[in-house]
Amino acid sequence: MENLRIVPLGGLGEVGKNMMVVEYGRNILIIDVGMMFPESDMYGVDYIIPDYDYLRGKEDRIRGIVITHGHMDHIGALPHFLQEFTAPVYATRLTRGLIEVNLRREVQKRVKINTMAPGDVLRLGPFKVEPFHVCHSIPDTVGLGIETPVGLIVHSGDFKFDHTPVDGWPPDMAKLADFNRRGVLALLSDSTNSGSPGATPSERLLTSAMEDVFREANGRIIVATFASLISRIQQVMDVASNFGRKVAIAGTSMVKNVKMARELGYLDVPDNLIVSLHEIHRLPPQEVAIMATGSQGEPRSIMGRLATGRHSSLRVVPGDTVVLSSHTIPGNEETVHRVINQLFQKGANVVYHPLSPVHVSGHASQEELKTLINILRPQFFIPIHGELRHLKQHAALAHQVGIPERHTAAVEHGHIIRFTENSMEGGERIPGGYVYVDGSWVGDAISPSILRDRNELAATGVCYIAFRYNQNQGQLIDHPVIQTRGIASQEVLSDLVIEAEDIVRRALKGIAPTTTPDVVEKT
C-alpha cells in the first residue's frame, strides 16, 4: 500500500501563509492557500506567499483545494496560485464570497469555485473530505475530517470552543465524538495560542468592551480591525446603532467585504446606519463612528495613513477615540507601536489590547487544545499554525494528555511526514521558503539579495556621481554633479562633496585620452 504524505508548504514554524498538501499516490488534496505579513525590515514587500514549487509538474494530480475559512492567512495567496494552477476550489458560502472579492474576473471564469457546508461529504479522488463547523473569529469556519486509504486525518482549522458564539452556532462536538468512534489516525491542530493558559474567552465579551468605549467617548470613534472579521464588524455596527452613531466604512477591502457580507446575509445592517466618508463631516462628532482597515499599522492602510496625516479626506483630531480591535501579529509590533504613538501625538485617545479587552482571540488556548486531543484520541499528533515555539508547546500539551512523544511531529514547513495505517515517520525536507510580492513583482524578481540591498541602502544611503568627460582630450567638460540620498544633510556634506569632486578628477587623470574617435557609420 502507498504511504500517505503530509507536506506543509506554509504555516508551520511561522504565523501565516498556511498551506498544506495531502498526497496519496498520484492524488493531491490542498488545504488553504494563505499569505503572511512581511517583517519590518523587508522594505517594499507587500506580503509573502508560500513557495509551491513542489506542485509544479503535478498540476494534473490536484483533486481539489479545500479552504477552512476566509482570513487572508488562509486565502490570501489563492489569486496567485490560481493564475498558475487550475483546480476546483471548495469553500463555505461566506468564505467563497471573500475569495471571489479578491479574484480577477478571468480567473473566476476559468476556475470552478464550489460552495460546501458543514455536514457535506466531498469525494476528491481517494479522499473523502467531511467539513465540520468550528468557532473562530469569522463565521462559516470549518475543520476537516479526511478519510484516506490509510486512515482518518482530522485538520482542526483555526478554532476555539466558544459555547456562546455571537452567531449562535456552537462547535460541532457531536462530529468530533463521531470521529473518535471511527478512530483517528492523526490530528493536525491549531497551535497559535498553545502558550496561553486556560480557555479563550467568548467573542460575546467584546460587545461589553465596545459599549464601554462608546459610552465614554465624546468625539468620533474610529475602530480598526481586519476587513475579514465579519462578526466583529457586526458587533461594532450593533453597538454604534445602540449609541446613536452613524457608521462610515474606510478601506477598499472592508468596503468590498461589507457589501458582499450584507448581500449574502452575514451582516444585518440597516441602510440608514451606514454613511459615506464625505457625509460624516456634516455630522456632530458624537454621532460618528468609522470602521477602518490597518490594525497592523501597514503604511498604506487607512490607519497607517491617518497616523502620518496622509489620508486624503480624513484627519485624526484631538477628541477622537481610536480602537485597535486586533491582536498584533508577531513581527508587526514595532509598526503597531509606532502608529499608536503617532495617534497619541495627534491628540487621540487610543484604546488597544491588552490594556482594554477590545480584542478576543479566535484561537483555542491550552485547556481547549487538550480537550480536543482528549475527545479525538488520535494515534498520531502534528501541531500546525504557529511559530516553532508554539508547535513545541502544543506537542508538550499532547504529551501531558497521553500522546507518546514518538507519536508527535513538531516540524516546520517543507518537512514531509509519511503515514501508513499504524506508523508515522519524518521524511526529507523539500527546498522552499518565502515568495515575496511587491506590487506586480512576484517571486524571483524580489530575491533575498534584493532585500539585502534594500536594507543596505536604508542603512547607509546612496551617492550618485554624474559628469561629462571629453574622451579625446582626457578632460572633464564641467564640474561633476554629486547627489546624495539618505546619508546626511547637504550642509553637513558640503565639504565632503568638494573632496569627492577632487577624487573624481584625480581618478579621471589616470585615464589616457582616446586618439581614435568613435565613428558612427550610416548604412
Regions found by a protein language model. Name each.
Residues 195-325, 329-331, 335-354, 358-378, ...:
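Hard-cation-handling environments
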Residues 1-66, 71-283, 301-315, 334-338:
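His/Asp/Glu-rich metal-coordinating catalytic cores
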